[in-house]
């Protein structure tokens, strides 16, 4: 089947036309100018009232259609940025190059990069609803927030007092969600000393790739491998059998992504007295790890190869300190939800490892659907204090607690029988809306961006059509709400 690079002939046509258009505009998180200017121009071209605030949020207002003037307004919300990750060896500049999207069968995906379905499909849905002349709906307060994937600067600085709605529909989730995790992002900074590579020792490069990666909240229950933790295990196995110097190490932050993504790649350069002996130990360790993850990570690749190095190694003490941190920092699923089955309770993700000239950074994302994340963060701080390294709090984001009236929930259950309500494992901006707009009824109704935050990300055309049509039906039913 030939690839459809322009997404033509897909339904709903307006959705895929919009999705293709925004995929041509670089919109990496932290680079909001282009996409927000495009949204403003789009609104102007269609006679829609819209403005952009200082945080680069775009707020658009669509009047109620005839007969819906007395219905409560509805907030529709998506975010305009995307996580930008590319495969090893792919030539792509996210600051200027369009995403090379294509459709094949029931799938829309991208060549060699993240697709941006998270949350481009939500943006495309909203653009289509705003311009549908046949639709029937209450007044729509449409919010496109900026920088959701990193700082959530848009959600933090949005003026919530401007909204009149009693109902809110988020289009940045997976299925029918009624709650989500809160989040704490932290950075661990360790000073790094220098020591010359010992005379006669040879350098080896360790490289881990081929992992799924993905979203550290929504994919936590899958218990995928974290490349940073695998690298730690390789080095620990080597240390038990021999000695080595650690020259540099890095992991995660593929394409600029932060610790919210599970690290899909990691690498290190080490110096050893006997390369053959070290390669033997590392090969055995690699086979052990591949066997452990043979089902969850069938494409895992662990390569060890000779290399040249012209820089100093870490001191032996700093090497041990870093190994202690990589080993002891909590990573992976911590607990499951006490009410909803197969739902995240709490998780911690060591998502970034970066050895720089004078320091080493480890970035950690901690999530929970209750208050357990605060205790997990206390654990991290006390561990780092014991080891004598610095911790920095990057941000703290609220959870989204269940807030749906019985009447609306009954309507939604009947409309979405294939999608039972559940809690999102990820952290979104919904908690800002529900905590700052008293009495707001909030749900998330969105097709799945499968494998988001990875280069395997894709959308199902069938599922997108289902959710788009159901949302149009829902808005029409809200005449008397």
Regions found by a protein language model. Name each.
Residues 224-241, 274-278, 320-327, 334-338, ...:
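His/Asp/Glu-rich mid-to-C-terminal helical/loop segments that flank catalytic regions of hydrolases
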Residues 20-24, 255, 268-269, 301-313, ...:
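A short beta-alpha structural unit
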Residues 68-166, 203, 316-319, 331-337, ...:
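Active-site metal-coordination/substrate-binding segment of hydrolases
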Residues 2-106:
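Acidic/His- and Gly-rich active-site-bordering loop/insert found
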Residues 221, 227, 259-332, 336:
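A conserved active-site cap/scaffold subdomain adjacent to cofactor or substrate pockets
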Residues 7-15, 338-341, 345-361, 365, ...:
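Zn-dependent metallopeptidase/amidohydrolase metal-coordination segment
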Residues 219, 228-248, 394-440:
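Active-site-adjacent substrate-binding region
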Residues 137-227, 235, 239:
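Fold-level recognition of mixed alpha/beta catalytic cores in primary-metabolism enzymes, strongest
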């Amino acid at each position: 089947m030939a690839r459809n690079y322009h997404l033509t002939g897909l339904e709903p046509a307006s959705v895929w036309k919009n999705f293709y258009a925004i995929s041509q505009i670089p919109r990496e998180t932290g680079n909001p100018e282009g996409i927000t200017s495009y949204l403003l121009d789009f609104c102007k071209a269609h006679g829609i009232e819209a403005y952009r605030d200082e945080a680069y949020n775009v707020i658009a207002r669509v009047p109620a259609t005839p007969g819906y003037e007395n219905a409560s307004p509805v907030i529709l919300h998506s975010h305009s940025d995307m996580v930008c990750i590319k495969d090893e060896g792919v030539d792509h500049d996210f600051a200027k190059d369009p995403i090379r999207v294509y459709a094949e069968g029931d799938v829309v995906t991208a060549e060699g990069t993240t697709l941006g379905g998270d949350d481009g499909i939500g943006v495309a849905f909203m653009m289509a609803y705003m311009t549908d002349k046949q639709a029937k709906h209450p007044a729509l307060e449409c919010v496109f927030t900026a920088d959701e994937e990193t700082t959530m600067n848009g959600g933090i600085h949005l003026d919530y007092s401007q909204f009149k709605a009693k109902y809110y529909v988020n289009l940045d989730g997976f299925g029918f969600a009624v709650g989500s995790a809160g989040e704490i992002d932290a950075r661990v900074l360790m000073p790094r000393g220098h020591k010359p590579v010992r005379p006669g020792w040879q350098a080896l490069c360790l490289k881990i790739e081929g992992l799924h990666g993905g979203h550290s909240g929504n994919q936590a229950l899958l218990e995928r491998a974290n490349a940073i933790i695998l690298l730690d295990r390789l080095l620990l196995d080597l240390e038990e059998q021999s000695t080595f110097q650690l020259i540099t190490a890095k992991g995660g932050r593929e394409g600029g992504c932060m610790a919210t993504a599970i690290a899909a790649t990691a690498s290190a350069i080490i110096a050893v007295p006997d390369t053959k002996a070290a390669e033997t130990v590392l090969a055995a360790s690699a086979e052990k790890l591949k066997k452990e993850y043979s089902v969850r990570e069938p494409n895992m690749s662990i390569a060890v190869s000779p290399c040249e190095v012209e820089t100093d190694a870490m001191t032996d003490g700093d090497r041990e300190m870093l190994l202690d941190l990589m080993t002891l920092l909590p990573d992976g699923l911590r607990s499951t939800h006490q009410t909803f089955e197969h739902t995240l309770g709490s998780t911690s993700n060591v998502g970034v490892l970066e050895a720089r000239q004078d320091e080493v950074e480890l970035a950690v994302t901690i999530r929970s659907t209750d208050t357990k994340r605060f205790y997990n963060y206390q654990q991290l701080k006390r561990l780092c204090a014991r080891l004598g390294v610095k911790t920095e709090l990057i941000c703290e984001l609220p959870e989204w607690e269940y807030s749906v009236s019985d009447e609306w929930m009954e309507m939604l259950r009947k409309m979405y029988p294939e999608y039972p309500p559940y809690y999102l494992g990820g952290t979104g901006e919904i908690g800002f809306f529900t905590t700052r707009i008293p009495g707001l009824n909030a749900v998330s109704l969105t097709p799945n961006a499968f494998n988001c935050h990875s280069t395997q990300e894709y959308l199902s055309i069938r599922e997108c059509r289902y959710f788009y049509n159901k949302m149009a039906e829902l808005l029409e039913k809200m005449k008397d709400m």
